[in-house]
A protein has these predicted regions:
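PP2C/PPM-type serine/threonine phosphatase catalytic domain
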Residues: 1-214
Length: 214
């Protein structure tokens, strides 16, 4: 709640959100969490991910950001792309070639994250820039969804042509039906109109501070 409150306070004062606003919100949320907890709970933190509408060189883009293992996916032309990279022990094992990506979810350390908002320390987000294109869908979700619903199932739900709200409801229902072992969040965002800006750019460049792996 602290993260949502702080990020929304910055977003409602302007049409577009920049990286400075996101990072200020995360710093303030970290302070809020520290004030709300007693000394025994100072190790408590939360993950955060999202997509903020931003301006880059006069053009609208999504600024995608994450801290932890919640994710943002892009669905377009029947293809599902994971935009964010988890800050987790198992992701580091995958990157190092120790385990396969398909084995990460069942690994005993799958719930151990290497970055979070809280812990009485600065949150360090990673950033990506995604062009705003008509027909594009974004899925913003917690690991409570992705641990229960595999990648192909996610793609099929997003491809079904239902409204953003109905798709999110059905994704949560699928996660609950599969066991629902963790908190489940799913938000689907559709781009229904576009000015044509960014229509020819199919890349997802990373921007902002050079990311570090915890």
């Amino acid at each position: 709640a602290a993260v949502v409150n702080r990020l929304s306070q910055g977003a409602v004062t302007q049409d577009f959100t920049d990286i400075d606003t996101i990072e200020r919100g995360l710093r303030e949320a970290t302070d809020d969490i520290a004030l709300a907890l007693d000394e025994k709970e100072l190790g408590v933190g939360t993950t955060v991910t999202g997509a903020a509408l931003s301006m880059l060189d006069g053009e609208p883009f999504w600024t995608v950001f994450n801290v932890g293992d919640s994710r943002v996916y892009l669905y377009e032309h029947n293809e599902l792309i994971q935009v964010t990279i988890d800050h987790s022990v198992v992701q580091e094992l995958v990157d190092a070639g120790v385990i396969r990506a398909e084995d990460a979810e069942s690994h005993p350390d799958s719930n151990v994250i290497t970055r979070a908002v809280g812990f009485n320390m600065d949150a360090i987000p990673d950033y990506w820039v995604v062009p705003v294109r008509r027909g594009l869908r974004l899925l913003i979700c917690s690991d409570g969804l992705t641990k229960e619903v595999n990648r192909e199932e996610l793609r099929l739900h997003l491809a079904a042509g239902r409204s953003a709200q109905q798709t999110a409801v059905e994704l949560i229902g699928a996660a609950l039906a599969a066991g629902g072992r963790d908190n489940i969040t799913a938000i689907v965002v559709d781009v229904v109109e576009s000015t044509g800006i960014g229509e020819s750019d199919n890349t997802i460049p990373r921007t902002g501070p050079t990311p570090t792996r915890g």
